[in-house]
């Protein structure tokens, strides 16, 4: 699959955990913009791919090239964040005793001043407006003064997504965003990710095939650390190897 102007490229990437190859000689270009899903059985290497891209896990071999010009496989996670790659993990990592606004404040100035000074830092009017804008885009503006721990599970996930995009990353990495959500929250999350994907690139690791079908721009399938198929959802579900290895297990 030819990709012009990829946002990130992996070249012969390998990751080993105590002799086990979690990622095995992966080479792939990911296109910019849209919502790109990475699917596969447990242990396929999906989350590890995200970990390598954001610097949380170092590859034993290979290169990770960001925006066709910068190798990032050896950079620290905080450096990668400042380059425009943001990560949202499966479980929300918000500050539950702080308000929604305070969480957003911490996110917008994180990395720009020492942590112990964050709560005293005053925001500019531009930053305050940006917080309101992002909260509104994720339907959280009405909860701006609410204690974040009082939010529903879905709202906590949306708050963390808001925190992840407040500094306008070019690439957002999301791990199983709909786990534990109600059907209504799942649909809303998909719509929010599609909205975000209109302006930036979103990678999503997910198991729910209905969610993937409804909200994917493209799908990459992994198995035992390797990429076995990629394309749109129709391409993937009609691929015989995918049916045998992955989809058949869900029947």
Could you tell me what each predicted segment is?
Residues 39-41:
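The feature captures the beta-strand-to-loop junction immediately N-terminal to the Walker
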Residues 63-82, 122:
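ABC ATPase NBD Q-loop/coupling interface
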Residues 116-143, 191:
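Conserved ABC ATPase "signature" region
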Residues 172-176:
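Catalytic Walker B motif of ABC-type/P-loop ATPase nucleotide-binding domains
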Residues 54:
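Helix-to-loop junction immediately C-terminal to a conserved catalytic motif
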């Amino acid at each position: 699959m030819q990709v012009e102007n990829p946002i990130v490229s992996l070249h012969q990437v390998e990751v080993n955990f105590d002799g086990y190859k979690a990622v095995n000689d992966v080479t792939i270009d990911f296109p910019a913009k849209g919502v790109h899903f990475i699917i596969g059985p447990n242990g396929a290497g999906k989350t590890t791919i995200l970990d390598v891209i954001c610097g949380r896990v170092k590859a034993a071999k290979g290169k990770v090239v960001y925006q066709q010009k910068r190798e990032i496989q050896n950079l620290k996670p905080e450096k990668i964040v400042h380059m425009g790659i943001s990560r949202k993990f499966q479980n929300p990592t918000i500050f539950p005793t702080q308000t929604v606004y305070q969480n957003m404040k911490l996110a917008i100035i994180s990395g720009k001043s020492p942590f112990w000074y964050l709560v005293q830092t005053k925001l500019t009017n531009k930053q305050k407006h940006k917080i309101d804008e992002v909260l509104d885009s994720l339907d959280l503006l009405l909860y701006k003064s609410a204690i974040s721990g009082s939010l529903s599970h879905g709202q906590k996930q949306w708050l963390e997504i808001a925190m992840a995009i407040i500094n306008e990353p070019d690439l957002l990495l999301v791990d199983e965003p709909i786990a534990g959500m109600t059907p209504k929250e799942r649909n809303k999350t998909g719509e929010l990710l599609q909205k975000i994907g209109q302006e930036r690139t979103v990678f999503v690791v997910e198991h729910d095939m209905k969610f993937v079908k409804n909200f994917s721009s493209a799908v990459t399938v992994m198995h035992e650390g390797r990429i076995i198929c990629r394309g749109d959802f129709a391409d993937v579900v009609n691929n015989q190897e995918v049916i045998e290895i992955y989809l058949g297990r869900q029947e």
